[in-house]
Regions:
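Short beta-alpha junction loops
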Residues: 111, 138-141
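Asparagine-centered polar/low-complexity signal
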Residues: 123-124, 137-139
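Single conserved hydrophobic/aromatic residue that forms the stacking wall/gate
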Residues: 1-7, 11
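Long, well-ordered, tryptophan-enriched scaffold segments
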Residues: 141-154
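Cofactor-binding active-site loop characterized by glycine-rich and histidine/acidic residues
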Residues: 12-128
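Short hydrophobic alpha-helical runs that function as membrane-insertion/retention elements
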Residues: 132-135
Length: 154
């Protein structure tokens, strides 16, 4: 019960955070990059694909991942962990090189933050001169050492 209850609470917070992101930012002009596939489900529901989650005969209308072929709100096919920051850095750099505007937001979970690609993305983000926002979804149930997330709270 403890873990399933915690998982349910975590997913509720993920849904609330995704709603807040869509309220504050103007997707798809502002580009939101989620880290792993399950983080994209509320995003998909908010961007016109909710029927695929509500009606069994429409389940096949969406993939289990973000997918640019499904929607302009998806910018990559994402399924692997620790990639959002690096991908968002690429979008931000491309936006800046083209003289465009708009926000780029990377959403990453605390467990994914310990991955090598996430750390490389943080290193590059520190040198990036453009507008890049990193949102850490700290659900506090990550089984990994918490030093990285604890350091980011300072």
């Amino acid at each position: 019960q403890g873990y399933s209850s915690a998982a349910s609470d975590v997913y509720k917070r993920q849904v609330e955070a995704t709603i807040a992101l869509h309220y504050v930012f103007e997707s798809p002009k502002d580009k939101i990059v989620f880290d792993v596939s399950h983080q994209t489900y509320p995003h998909k529901m908010l961007t016109g694909r909710k029927d695929a989650y509500l009606y069994e005969d429409k389940y096949d209308e969406v993939s289990g991942y973000s997918n640019p072929e499904e929607s302009d709100h998806d910018h990559f096919i994402i399924g692997h962990t620790s990639t959002s920051i690096s991908l968002a850095c690429g979008l931000a750099k491309g936006r800046d090189l083209q003289g465009q505007s708009g926000n780029v937001i990377a959403v990453i979970g605390d467990g994914s933050l310990s991955g090598g690609e996430a750390l490389e993305g943080l290193d590059y983000a520190a040198e990036l001169q453009g507008n890049l926002i990193i949102v850490v979804n700290d659900n506090m149930i990550c089984p990994l050492p918490r030093t990285m997330v604890e350091c980011m709270r300072i």
